[in-house]
């Protein structure tokens, strides 16, 4: 994309993959965690991306819009970025689109679950590592280092816009595809 945060790094296996079918390999789209905050980046998932490629599975390590002081309520940009990255993945050469997966950690796990529920093209598997499965509970528990990450990402409290919070809440939007919660 045009913005500095709109990029993804593709990690392909160097050698022939044991998972290869018709010249294509499965791929995992990686979504990092970090309370949806700008200070946390896709560098968090780089070791996993490298390990996946070494094991014979491609990795699509994405970046997306995160909030920062003075630039909050960015949830729509975040979701737009991850949806576009998911769509772009289907266009990459040598990727087996039938075996594409999503993996996210913490707030990235939240985004992975939400993407799996909302995307037209369903992932073969969604892996959510220590995900935020209930945004409203996370907000009530003051999840994050400063206790307000979810409401700053969304831009309001659950009381101010309960419908929006339900739409962004994985527990209210179950995915119709295989899910592995770790």
Residue ranges and their predicted role:
Residues 181-182:
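Short beta-strand/loop motif that positions the catalytic acidic residue
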Residues 39-49, 60-97:
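Catalytic nucleophile-loop/oxyanion-hole region of alpha/beta-hydrolase
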Residues 27, 53-63:
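A fold-wide structural signal in alpha/beta-hydrolase
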Residues 84-143:
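Primarily recognizes the serine-hydrolase "nucleophile elbow" in alpha/beta-hydrolase
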Residues 23-33:
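Short beta-strand element of the alpha/beta-hydrolase
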Residues 30, 36-37, 67, 134:
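Active-site loop signature of alpha/beta-hydrolase-fold enzymes
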Residues 137-171:
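Mobile cap/lid helix-loop segments that gate and shape the active-site cleft of serine hydrolases
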């Amino acid at each position: 994309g045009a913005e500095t945060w709109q990029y993804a790094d593709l990690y392909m296996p160097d050698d022939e993959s044991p998972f290869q079918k018709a010249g294509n390999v499965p791929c995992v789209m990686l979504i990092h965690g970090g309370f949806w905050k700008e200070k946390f980046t896709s560098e968090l998932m780089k070791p996993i991306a490298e390990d996946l490629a070494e094991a014979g599975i491609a990795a699509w390590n994405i970046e997306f819009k995160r909030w920062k002081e003075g630039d909050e309520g960015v949830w729509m940009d975040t979701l737009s970025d991850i949806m576009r990255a998911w769509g772009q993945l289907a266009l990459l050469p040598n990727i087996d689109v039938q075996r594409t997966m999503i993996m996210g950690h913490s707030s990235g796990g939240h985004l992975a679950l939400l993407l799996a529920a909302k995307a037209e093209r369903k992932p073969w598997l969604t892996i959510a590592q220590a995900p935020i499965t209930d945004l409203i509970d996370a907000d009530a528990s003051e999840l994050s280092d400063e206790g307000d990450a979810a409401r700053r990402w969304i831009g309001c409290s659950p009381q101010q816009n309960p419908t929006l919070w339900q739409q962004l809440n994985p527990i209210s939007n179950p995915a119709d595809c295989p899910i592995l919660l770790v």
